[in-house]
Amino acid sequence: MNARPAPSPYERRPRRLRAAGAALLLLAAAGAGAAAPPEPCFRRADRTIASLDPAFASTMAAGRAAALVYETLLQFDYEARPYRLAPYAAEAMPEVSEDGLELTFRLRDDVRFGPDEAFGGPGATRRATAADAVFSLKRLADAKLSSPGWWILAGKVEGLDAFREASAGPEPTDYDRDVPGLRALDDRTLRIRLVRPCPDFLWGLALPYASILPREVVEARGEDFGLGEAGSGPFRLASWRRGHRMLFVRREGRDPARDRTPELPDAVGAEPYRAVEYLAMGDASTRWLSFLRGTFDLATEISRDDWDAVVAADGSLAPDLAARGVRMVAEPSLETTYMAFNMDDPVVGTNAALRRAISCAFDSAQWVALNRGRILPATGPLPPGVDGRIEGPSPWSFDPERARALLAEAGYPGGIDPATGRRLALTLDLGSTDQEMREGAELIASFLDRVGISLSLSYSTFPQFLRRVNRREAQMFLLTWVGDYPDPLNFLQLFVSSNASPGPNRCNYASPSYDALFEEAARATDPARRAALVRAMQEEVRDACPWVFVGHRREVVLLGPRLRNYRLHDFPLGAEKHWRRAP
């Protein structure tokens, strides 16, 4: 998925190339043959990913795929609303000490890694242990790996930040270095000691970043790890034709009861899926036509052009789709789309008046109209449904005259760059080449054109786009943050300086005052004080404008006629294990 901007932590270690080569050849052969998957098979369109290494699962597509193959200590409860956590590789929720600092997990005794030569020969396997969990969390902290998921642990686990600092040196990372906050008390007992009570810490342990990996397999593959090797999850990767198709099949020998959930009424008599197939398909219209032909069992991200064919005037499903047996579920999604300024950029990053001018040039009403009501206007970083969201308008909302005045204050009267005598020229990076992205980007360019700014549009594939963003090469870029869990700090951590690229603070905002507010909020146990801190952080970023707040998507999902036991979920990690197909 994400390119790794820093050297791999394993590139200086000898690697067991025979094992790595065998895995590569197996997947290549399977992908080339494109054998028919076992039925019933769930099929969907998805975006391409570069790796199944869960340490780099920072997109929804990569997270969904990694969650099929690997297990975490905890998982999101499929049924519960409001959302809550449930045990997964752990046999129960952790025991928590009275001071809230020690968490003790007991691993299930039936969590087994898939076969791999690294375990001692062809077909060899073994049980997952607490030591594997310790290794996996240390790996996430390794500075050489440069995982975008480090934020779930940063500043929280006793001794882990010191481990990360030591791993930044030129010598190979010592994974046997003691970390007081990570202890395998025996094969099945893991103790984590926090530096302070962290109300949101457990949510992070349900994300693919925190997947439990077998050390010997990771070290055998070295920099080639990421082909779905030796996971313990409900599916295994059977074939992968990069950029085209991924096929996952149910893991042999896994107890089906582990993945069973109370069934919805529509699931009576329906059969669990034996396989999951992801087909890479970037163009929205092609995805839609494929769904109508029955190629896919589910359709998401309905395009503007297809919206009127999906939703009737009263907001219900269009009658012709209902007649086909298609069903619709819809609700606001837990995500925020934003146009970011790279705060390291010498033009936009150093000039608050310029950023505010661009924010005032953004016409939210026209953006919502372009998207035919699929988008709700954004006034800050928190989406609807997240506690503490400021509902009032942004201090730099749409006002073209104010935008022009701010441009003059920024040193660009009339939009003219005094250094060139011509219009100020900026560049917006975009992570897709499809028609919908182009139309949206051209509309944004027209907003800036109105106030005198020339905006160039740079399109690339999503992996290429992320590489540029992670390397801080993009001046401005359009991106969506999908909440990892329903807590305001999950969105507000996108502005913490220690989370700068390649971490989730992709705009590289750095403010000591903001960092102090966030640190206090992360420790706060008094709800009123925490709410005040959440409000103060929103007020700061709304004023500083490291982002233009673009919108929040209304999640609309169409279910194929045979898909059963589906619940709309903001965190659908591994959800396919719960789904069924009707006869």
For the regions a language model picked out, list residue spans one by one.
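Append "and occasionally in soluble cytosolic enzymes with long acidic Gly/Pro-rich linkers
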Residues: V249-R250, R260, G349-S446, R450, ...
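N-terminal lobe/hinge region of extracytoplasmic solute-binding protein
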Residues: A45-E98, A230
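Extracellular/periplasmic solute-recognition and catalytic clefts
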Residues: A238-V249, P265, L279-D344, A369
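Short, well-ordered beta-strand elements
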Residues: E39-T48, E102-F105, A133-S136, L190-R191, ...
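Aromatic- and charge-enriched surface segment that lines or borders ligand/interaction sites
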Residues: A92-I152, R191, Y278, R287-S290, ...
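Extracytoplasmic/peripheral linker and loop segments enriched in polar/acidic and small residues
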Residues: A323-G325, R356, C360, V368, ...
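Long beta-strand-rich cores associated with HINT superfamily self-processing modules
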Residues: V557-P583
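Gly/Pro-rich hinge or "lid" segments in bacterial periplasmic/extracellular proteins
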Residues: E79-A80, D161-T189, R193-E277, D283-T286, ...
